[in-house]
Amino acid sequence: MSLTVWNIESIKDVAEMLGIGNLADEPAAAIAMDLEYRIHQVVQEATKFMVHSKRTVLTSADISSALRTLNVEPLYGFNNSRPLEFHEAAVGAGQNSLYYLDDEEVDFEKIINAPLPKVPRNISYSAHWLAIEGVQPAIPQNPTPSDHTVGEWASKGTSGVMPGASTAAKEARNGVTSMDNVEIKPLVRHVLSKELQLYFERITSALLDETNVELRDAALSSLRDDPGLHQLLPYFIMFLSDSVTRNLGNLVVLTTLMHMAWALLDNPNLFVEPYVQQLMPSILTCLVAKRLGSDPNNHEHYALRDLAAFLLGIVCDRFGNVYYTLKPRVTRTALKAFLDNTKPYSTHYGAIKGLKTMGKEAIRVLVVPNIKVYEVLVRKTLEKGNEEEIYEANKCMDALYDALLLLRDDQLPNQRTLPPNASGLLEKNVGSLMAEKIMKENDTSLLLGLLE
């Protein structure tokens, strides 16, 4: 007598379907017991998938996953999209009822003639800043502050009221929620300690103090070396930008601010990369501004422009690979200022220094072809200008010559010889004034570099 829930007759029916006739009762009973064990095993594994999926209903997907776990080919044609429908088949009188699964009939001709489905898109990944220095940037990928606030209140709802809550919280505890009495405060980007606030005030006041040089140097040294200033970095960048705009007539303060930018860039503990876009306008202002300082006859602004050009080179070399449009934009700004005849020579000087920091190819491609045209403006100033204008024009010519030194030929002068008409070719390339200056210096390496 079989102790399984499976009828021996069912086993014999399946055997006959497979072409096995006259199956004895003993092997049929053994197969029935093994079948019961296998089904229990599959259901047990499928239940694990159901529990891990946090569901209370067993689905055909769980059965398929269990079969794959047991290294058995899963059943095909069964899915969770529609429920299984069993129909009773007509059998003879006195026989047990027979039920079968009502499968949907599929027309092969219709499937063959149907259009192919669309090809799915390729898998792609995109990166964005989740947070920068503890601040979530306002980009489409990140939730807005309003969404965050609404989601926070929706999640609280009627559950969990903080101790010491107001009347609105008591109403929420009783199941009544009202948003009318809720005051939504703006998000605070940074919460600075009193020590950091005091440090910021002392540093900024020391940098703007023109009388105490020692205190100013100590402040710059602190900005260059202290490791715990990352929270203050955005405030220092904002202070730098505002102070440059307000102190264009004070060379001492502007020079100090450029040294401040240098100190922030030199500090190995600060991550300046996210603030390059806010830092560049201040540096470019000190580089190509029409007038720096209150006295037009004070030539110390040239040293400030040299310092700004030096900082410009540091920023472009360090962050040019991250911001791939940084160098082209800076080059375009400097070239536009250099070629604008309405700009003063002080702006031209800063533009030439800025183009020099862009490297050898920028000088060869952008500066050299325009020297001969620029000479027309310089020659007119040398002939009809006053003493101050002549001085500024000569400073620009000196800056151009200094930029051309980047084009020196690396080979030794005795390894190559100059063409017989070197002077004429040089004058044709860079104009008579610059050619005369170069020939006077007798720099053979520079001559070879310009005549390539």
From Swiss-Prot:
Which BP terms in the Gene Ontology apply to this protein?
RNA polymerase II preinitiation complex assembly; transcription initiation at RNA polymerase II promoter; transcription initiation-coupled chromatin remodeling
Q: What happens when the gene is disrupted?
A: Cells lacking taf6 are not viable.
Keywords for the protein's UniProt record, in alphabetical order: Nucleus, Transcription, Transcription regulation
Identify the residues that the record assigns to the Histone-fold domain, covering every copy.
4-68
> Which Pfam family, an example, fits this chain?
TAF
Q: What GO molecular-function term can you cite, just one? A: protein heterodimerization activity
Which coarse location class applies to the principal site listed for this UniProt protein?
A: nucleus
Which InterPro entries does UniProt cross-reference here?
Answer: ARM-type_fold, Histone-fold, TAF6, TAF6_C, TAF6_C_sf, TAF_TATA-bd_Histone-like_dom
Q: Which domain of life is it from?
A: Eukaryota
As for subcellular location, the record says: Nucleus
GO CC terms of this entry: cytosol; nucleus; SAGA complex; transcription factor TFIID complex
Stated family: Belongs to the TAF6 family.
Q: What does this protein do?
A: Functions as a component of both the DNA-binding general transcription initiation factor complex TFIID and the transcription coactivator SAGA complex. Binding of TFIID to a promoter (with or without TATA element) is the initial step in pre-initiation complex (PIC) formation.
Under the subunit heading, UniProt states: Component of the 1.8 MDa SAGA (Spt-Ada-Gcn5 acetyltransferase) complex, which is composed of 19 subunits tra1, spt7, taf5, ngg1/ada3, sgf73, spt20, spt8, taf12, taf6, hfi1/ada1, ubp8, gcn5, ada2, spt3, sgf29, taf10, taf9, sgf11 and sus1.
- What's in the domain note? The histone-fold domain (HFD) is required for interaction with taf9.
This protein is called SAGA complex/transcription factor TFIID complex subunit Taf6
State the organism named in the record: Schizosaccharomyces pombe (strain 972 / ATCC 24843) (Fission yeast)
* Gene for this chain: taf6
